[in-house]
Amino acid sequence: MSIEAQKSSCNLYTGYFAKLKIYKQENLIPVSIAGVAPSWYTHSNEFEFKKLAPKFWFYKKYKDGIFAKEEYTKHYLNEVLSKWENPNTLKQELIDLFQKENSNGIILLCYESPNNFCHRQIVREFLQINEYRTSKGTYNDK
């Protein structure tokens, strides 16, 4: 398979920082989509894609209980995801930037555990991708 064919068939997943070690063991390329990644995250083989981070103003209103999940989602869709015409454009941008030969895919990371609402759920729905499931356990946001 050519590199271009590998790039276009890249697996994309979502996950959270607490499971980073497992994702790396399973040969996934970690990409932070948080506004601020953890200080320990800054290694040479870890990436950030701040274009998918929520805007601080509506993130803070959600965390402070001023915005409900629905209001946060509306702002995230309008102010962040609206930059892409369609999900395939965003998928291709992520693949072009981060996919490497011999990896098992790209995993988009944030802080929240699977049981808590997070913008990565909105991203996952927009891209029609899955929370990563591993042989060491299932990490599913449902």
PLM features per residue range, with description:
Residues 2-142:
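Residues lining hydrophobic/aromatic ligand-binding pockets adjacent to catalytic sites
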